[in-house]
Amino acid sequence: MTKVVVCALYKFVSLPHFESIRAPLLAMMEQAEIKGTLLLASEGINGTVAGTQEAIEALLVWLNSQNGLDNIVHKLSFDDEMPFYRTKVKLKNEIVTMGVEGIDPLKVVGTYVKPQDWNALISDPDVILVDTRNDYEVQIGTFKNAVNPVTETFREFPEYVKQNLDPAKHKKVAMFCTGGIRCEKSTAYLKEQGFDEVYHLEGGILKYLEEVKAEESLWEGECFVFDNRVAVNHDLKKGQYDQCNACRMPITEAEKQSPAYVQGVSCPHCIDKISDEQRKRFVERERQVNLAKARNEAHIGSDVNQVIEARREKKEAQRRLAAEKNNAKKSQVL
């Protein structure tokens, strides 16, 4: 039975005294045993956290009681295991970093399109559909016919727009991201650049997967998420991907069979990109993680390693159990 509720939330709102919110918010989360990270800035709040249903409900009630933080946009998904191992509330300059001064979604933003209306919009041949996420996210799943800007960070998105999009040529632009927050800024940026008809998926991919039936969906693949689940499928359950602890790229079970894959050290995506010094450091980190595991201790920075290792052991145990049952059946037949 699924016990962990994962809550992705954000809200753009003027928070001039956001620093004062950090301590009570962190205390509330720790008391409720909520794990994950929330970001606070003068422009609002953003993050993903996880806990019991009661804990997440309590957090939303607490936030709703704070001036300006009521009616926060949030999406819920579920997991059998806690995807975070720490509780953090960080103070930032931006809750999602684009690095462009003066972009304010509270002043100007694109047109929100509900998940139920999204298919009709992106099926319009006059609409250019742009995935605002990073390349490694796009690689494991995106909408049919979406353009991949091939960015490594969201900071690179404005340059992509300057080089590839033209208000005179691209009359209708639709954009999407994981939960909606990056599109708040990307659509605001396009509006500032003179684009007229700019649309974005309200609630992001996660809301679309929640509300649109798989048989009607135009989504292809899985959706990358920034926690130890790595990706979720159309049912918002953990998908088939793990993550390379060296480069953080999502990897498949097939890629883990490659000679280039060394747990905690390298994978087919980064084997030719990491230096000898990095390789030595990763080998030592993996050694320390294994030593800590043998002593039943938590190694700093090993959250992802721990979850991946736990899931790996769980899969192996399931395989052994299935093999034993199969052998038992064969013995009975004989």
Curated annotation (Swiss-Prot):
Q: Which of the seven top EC classes does this enzyme belong to?
A: oxidoreductase
- Kindly indicate whether the keyword Oxidoreductase belongs to this entry: yes
**HAMAP family listed in its UniProt record:** TrhO
Pfam assignment, any one = Rhodanese
EC numbers: 1.14.-.-
The gene name reads trhO
Is Flavoprotein one of the keywords? no
Domain (Rhodanese): residue spans on this chain: 123-217
What species does this protein belong to?
A: Shewanella baltica (strain OS195)
Question: Per its UniProt record, what InterPro entries does this chain match?
Answer: Rhodanese-like_dom, Rhodanese-like_dom_sf, TrhO, TRHO_N
What sections of the protein cross the membrane? none
Please describe what this protein does. Answer: Catalyzes oxygen-dependent 5-hydroxyuridine (ho5U) modification at position 34 in tRNAs.
* Reaction equations catalysed: uridine(34) in tRNA + AH2 + O2 = 5-hydroxyuridine(34) in tRNA + A + H2O
List the molecular function annotations (GO) for this entry: oxidoreductase activity, acting on paired donors, with incorporation or reduction of molecular oxygen
The protein here is known as tRNA uridine(34) hydroxylase
For this UniProt record, the keywords arranged alphabetically read as follows: Oxidoreductase, tRNA processing
